[in-house]
């Protein structure tokens, strides 16, 4: 035969393609050939390989660029590399096989391209097995042996059997696609693992797919201490899992996306995943275990898997990650999603891991997990779940009733939250839970064996969407130092509760969310129950150590029997100029309204919302705004005597600071500012003249509630006036004014959250002022004054943002004033005049009372009392009908003080 080939070579310069086909038909290439470039190789027949580099062939680098290989026939392989010293570089070509690679059902683990020794470098290539299924070893690339290597780039590897790497092989795949049958690394070890050396595979920016038709149990399987590193890419499909790692495998996945794909998984069970019914099994070539119920993004048993900045999405039937005996999973960043199933589930191939090997799962570096259950436990092995580094996980932690197996024990389920991690869910399955600078948002009643908190670790009883759905946390032991955020349902007499069954220690704080509803009775609200004699202490973390509930504030108190409850807080004595009673005495009874209404208990401190509602309502606030708008004649019209017999138009602005104590709410300050515009017509009559006019204005009052927040009122008013000035010095001024007031407030409750309230009301008032000026020849004058004003404020009803019900009944004010003004008229050149003055008045509020109800509890506000007022001002006639006026006032009383009031105005007379 060799002589025949020698003669052919010497006889004629045959074309390379024809010669290659002839040599391929004999099963081996001659040593004289170093490459197969730009060829089309077609083979048919048993074991007819397209390119076959045997161990006896010379080593070195060989190339096949731009080459197409097609083979068909039993166990025919497009490329078979068996020489450890050889390297085949296959670029810009394709290899296709369509023959049966198995032998009467006996697996031979052959591929369209097989590397048993040596190195394959494939670039921009297509390797396709188009004739077989997973069960018949339809493998596109098979690399096996410690002397076998492959480096694939920018290529497509397609076959129902996928890509198989085992027995110590090393493979690198970049920017490529492995389609149909997935990627499978390693094999199950025997009892002597050293018999099967681990393989190592590196994928970079490579997608792996296992379609249902291929029958591949997993899109990627890593077995028997083999190692996979993937950086970038999508893993899709698999009958039962996206990635399976078993028996000592090591998997590193970075920037990966793992999902099932559109087609249903072959192992899916209609009606939902059945974790408790999972059958132990595994994945890999050969179908060495039954397919499990549901689909798992990552299935780990006796192996280590690291996911970094990766996405795992589980369908309705399945879990994002399943962990079996001895599994170690670390998730750094990225997300795990199982909206209708379990994020993490225990189960899998127990027989391929050491007996009672613990399971460890860590979510860190901002990893996010979300599912109906965060962890579903069905194995008795010890489980440790750790959330740290800002990880955020949602879902319950649950367990099936684990069977009792003779000679074995059920290991603990331990959970650790640390470093700003957050878990949202409920549990009755956790044996120990530690929370260190992290948060557990408890969504339902829960039971924990041992709870330990540190570094402001907190348990947040989730605010319910439905009132009355309170929650109870029951623990055997409590230790450390932490924070519990709780809810109360005062109108139902219910609250969240912490119950410690065996031992409680440490210093803990309770933060209670505000409630706008009123307690159903005077009974206390129980928050914590500890065993009698426990060393644990509890304090309120709310502002000032008090909780706003409905109308009043509450504090935390222990009753000596291990119970910690909310009880009514006494109001601190407010600094007032009037004599104050001793600490916490019974206060005199308040006047009863006409209709019976609950009265506030003596000495109780109002909540922030109730205090704001009381101070915003009633007649007191509205009347002080109305009087700021009204004020005296001289500040409204200037000095009419400076321009006799003349009508005109005018405008004025004013600003005032008020300090109010209505005896129902806490003292507060209000700053008032506004303006008025008006015009009048002068009508001469015998002995004097009338000024008849109209006015309109806007006023804003800004309130500050010390330590709570504030509010404001916008007032728009219109009115008319009639002023009579007699030649004898007597004057009479009458006004009628109607106002519309828009009131609101925004305060911070004791829990730090804002509470808002607003409503609209109206007011109407009238005033009558009279006086007489006595003038001296040198310009000095003396003017006694008297004024009576009546104002009626309407009411309103509304509900604050926290649910506090408020009803303002409005009220009436009757204010009298007696004053004396002293000044001097100074004549200037050009007919101009200046008239400075000083004034002193005494004011008496005869009524000023109103009632504000919060949750049906009546609070009577009143500003009745006397105050003094001092002022100075100046009016100036500038000639040609122009005049200016300005004033300053100071007023002081026990319930209403005005440290400063400024007015300035201008009038033009014609």
From Swiss-Prot:
InterPro entries: Autotransporte_beta, Autotransporte_beta_dom_sf, Autotransporter_adhesion, Autotransporter_pectin_lyase_C, OM_autotransptr_brl_dom, Pectin_lyase_fold/virulence, Pertactin, Pertactin_central. Residues 572-601 have a biased composition (Pro residues). Residues 565-605 are annotated as: Disordered. Residues 266-290 are annotated as: 5 X 5 AA tandem repeats of G-G-A-V-P. Residues 1-34 form the signal peptide. Sequence repeats lie at residues 266-270, 271-275, 276-280, 281-285, 286-290. The record marks 631-632 as: Cleavage. GO terms for biological process: cell adhesion. Residues 579-593 are annotated as: 5 X 3 AA tandem repeats of P-Q-P. SMART domains: Autotransporter (SM00869). A motif (Cell attachment site) lies at residues 260-262. Pfam families: Autotransporter (PF03797), Pertactin (PF03212). Keywords: Cell adhesion, Cell outer membrane, Membrane, Periplasm, Repeat, Secreted, Signal, Transmembrane, Transmembrane beta strand, Virulence. One of its GO terms (cellular component) is cell outer membrane. NCBIfam families: autotrans_barl. The signal peptide, cleaved at the inner membrane, guides the autotransporter protein to the periplasmic space. Then, insertion of the C-terminal translocator domain in the outer membrane forms a hydrophilic pore for the translocation of the passenger domain to the bacterial cell surface, with subsequent cleavage. Synthesized only in the presence of low Mg(2+) concentration. Monomer. This is Pertactin autotransporter. The lineage of its organism: Bacteria, Pseudomonadati, Pseudomonadota, Betaproteobacteria, Burkholderiales. The gene is prn.
